[in-house]
Amino acid sequence: MTQKNLCLYFQIHQPTRLRLYRFFDIGKDSHYYDDFTNRTILKRVADLCYLPMNKLLLELINQHKGAFKVAFSISGSALEQFERYAPEVIDSFRKLADTGCAEFLCETYYHSLASLASEPEFKHQVLKHKAAIEHYFGVTPVTFRNTELIYSDNIGAQVYDMGFHTMLTEGAKHILAWRSPDFVYSDDRQTRLKLLLRNYSLSDDIAFRFSDRSWAEWPLTAEKYLGWLKNDINTSAGDVINLFMDYETFGEHQNAASGIFDFMKYLPETILNDGTFRFSTPSEVAKACKPVSSLEVPEPISWADEERDVTAWLGNELQQEAYNKLYAQYEKLALVNDPALYNDFGHLQESDHFYYMCTKFFSDGEVHKYFNPYDTPYEAFINYMNVLSDFIIRVDEEYSATVAKFATSENQETEKKKPAKKAEPAENKKTKTTLASEKTVKAAKKSAGKAVKPEAAKEKKNSKPAVKKAVKKKSE
């Protein structure tokens, strides 16, 4: 019997949370981030999830001598916070990378919605994230996953053009219809791009329902879960089961007391001893399995909420106004050379800021609410727009300075390119000077014979050039 593939993928992201930024801070203070909260949460999640889970996975990889494999995607925002507040977390991920049994995926550096807004900015962030993964872990990512598994035909084509041949996304019902997520598919426009689809039911059994005591299947054991995996793959006759989830599931969303670490400790052994499945990384799945058909996805899908679309971030007027106003700054920023501004632009793109403004209720809303620093979506919107207002002032100032500098430089270049005047013979100069002097003398003699009225002289003496008043435009 041919073994089926089991692909475990974990998302790691920590947003750069904004501090309380009041209206009166606009134009006065350009530090936008709540460093204390970011540090506190990062340190806590590192102790509860990242460090113990990485330690467990390393033990499992060594125990099973390479038969157990996983995949990670770590946002650039999370990497920055690891380096700043918990460098030991990066070291623990490096140890996993060194085993060769952990694949590191590429995504948008800032865990942003750039793929929906700006193709150049999307590409910039992907390349920046790729460079970061190479820097921290010494590997070049070959598989792509977009922020929150957002995908469409258009995004898939862009991803392929950037050199990726495998991409992860959601196994959304309204896209698959009667088909199963347990197969590899291809992009509708670029058939060479292979798509791995999340099995959301089996993924959510661990990510959301594991510690729910009201759940009819509680408690979930490794043996019971293996039975579900086998039943699913036998029913679908598929090639792979993709289990994609937040890494914070382990120890943070589902605390240690729930038994989540014990479950994970025994799951690989239970699965490998059975022999039905082998653990595979996304790139290994793509290499081993051929696409059964293409998927047509004209509108973006994601792994968020029941709709599996992007309304979690762009579903109301608050979110749309903030999103449009932010990305309207891109063209100006593309012309200035200010790393600090561009860094702030990146962090303001983080999808979390828009999620905090969401006014819907989701099946996974409680998880996100746990990390939400705001009591209401309206507070999130007001605070974000205050920050954005200050940011736009800085962008406009830098843009104006850049344009002025460019104009000055261009004028100087134009003057340099003008042909130099020919030197005139001394005799000509002398003749011109003499003629000018003669004209001056004649004019003086002519005016000497005319009387000047005292009033006219006084008026002429007291006259001053007109001065236009500069009207300072009030900033909005």
Annotate the PLM regions.
Residues 89-106, 127, 139, 160-197:
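Acidic, His- and aromatic-enriched active-site or binding-groove loops in soluble protein domains
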Residues 121-148, 229-244:
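CE4/NodB-like, metal-dependent polysaccharide N-deacetylase domain
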Residues 2-51, 62, 182-193, 197, ...:
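Active-site and substrate-binding clefts of carbohydrate-active enzymes
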Residues 11-15, 75-77, 109-112, 138, ...:
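An acidic- and aromatic-residue-enriched active-site/binding cleft used to recognize and process polar
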Residues 54-58, 90-94, 123-133, 156, ...:
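Generic structural signal for well-ordered alpha-helices
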Residues 115-117, 175-183, 205-206, 289:
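Short, charged, surface-exposed secondary-structure boundary motifs
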Residues 3-10, 16-118, 142-145, 165-170, ...:
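Short, well-structured secondary-structure segments
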Residues 412-476:
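Intrinsically disordered, polybasic Lys/Arg-rich low-complexity tracts
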